[in-house]
Amino acid sequence: MDPFDSEGRALVRESSREHQHEEEEIRVIGEGGGFFDIRDLQDTWVRVQVQAGDLIVLPPKAYHRFTPKGKVEMRRIYATGVDYSAVFREA
């Protein structure tokens, strides 16, 4: 995701909106980094900084958002097959 090109800007807009997935989200950070903000059980934000070489696993239905810190490459690992859908939280 390159936040400096048009496709990257669209991805940044989408990933920075608070959302959840029915399945766990497993990400490997290939290059660059950024911040995952994740809601805890009390609905408070917890910020996790990720960088190249990190692996992060978000539990199913955990509301979260991602903010890149410059250009970032991430890969998603699917535990149960490729079905990527997001449910966005209303403001």
Short names for language-model regions:
Residues 12-26, 43-44, 50-51:
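A short beta-loop-beta micro-motif enriched in histidine and acidic residues
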Residues 1-14:
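Short, well-structured hydrophobic secondary-structure segments
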Residues 50-70:
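Conserved metal-binding segment of the jelly-roll/cupin
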Residues 65-91:
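Double-stranded beta-helix
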